[in-house]
Amino acid sequence: MSFDFDKIIDRKGSACIKWDGMEKFLGSADALPMWVADMDFLTPAYITEAIALKASHGVFGYPLREDGYFTSLMQWLQRRHQWNVERDWITFCPGVVPAVNIAVLANTLPGDKIIVQPPVYFPFFTAVTDHKRNLVYNNLVLRDGRLCMDFDNLETLAADGAKMLILSNPHNPGGSVWTRDELLQMAAICLKHNVIILSDEIHCDLVYKPFKHTPVASLSQEISNHTITTVAPSKTFNLSGLSTASVIIENSNLRRKFNLQLDHLHIGGGNIFGNIASEQAYLHGDSYVDELMDYLGKNVEMLKKYVAENLPNIEVIEPEATFLVWLDCRKMGMSDEELNKFFLYTARVGMNPGAMFGPGGEGFMRMNIGCPAITLMQGLHQIKKAFAFI
């Protein structure tokens, strides 16, 4: 099977945040959207056809999450990541961000310290502060063009009474695929100080060769018993609008507390199309993901080459995973406000300002390259032309 990732899909007017929410969320509708983390590719036909078949039935009552939802995910995780998961460990949740918030509510108390590792996916911050927990930072370190964990500081924070670590694995926005050794070192610190590991693995399928994703909970049973993992087909298969994710918890006590909180909030029902899409994605998605990663890999190479030849004041932090690229723009000598205005209004390219990802994000921008190559090249040309106005 072959997928046409070069095909241009007109998303304007489709009520999508990425294209139709530019004015509301970024402040300009007159820019090329290369920001929010969904792709401009068609969802695979075997998914859309299954949704259409269900829609043709014409009745959309309360859905039953059947065996296929669970077994397809279990088989996918074993096939793609060599992680053996049991059905009882899996809980549905309407999105990874809700799952992170529920895990915080279920396992910590107001005033508890929770570690995050910025620059990182910004909803992690509000998942802590919205619930009156205390946010503590273990800032990542940019070393040889890669964001790395500071294990000495992590040890200090864990020893100081932190109750939970929220991990982005693989990392968003930096694209680091944490190695087995890095994860073992991180987990050893957390186990030593009884810190729960909340591992957001939504980007786990989007890893470039030769790197390999390691689920934290696959490292050992002891580590698994201290870990809550979130996964979803949304980034991989462009299904974010269907609000479907899964939470995997081996520890029965942690799972009981999570499910109790989920039940109290009455948000565990899900939607009929999300169930179908998730099952089809995990049953039939191997060739799609393989071809997608080959295409995205070519986009990365195109980006690196163009920036090296034309944009000397920008450095690409080469991603090991995700369709999101962390751009080091500090040599441009601009404040964060000036940087955002330059790209949004002068270059007319809408990206996420690095500062929104917390400490360490200052002077950076996050670019979404999950688009046809011609769209990526258009954005790069616009940025090059904009430098003439500096």
Give the role of each language-model region.
Residues 60-188, 205-206, 213-218, 222, ...:
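Conserved core of the PLP fold type I
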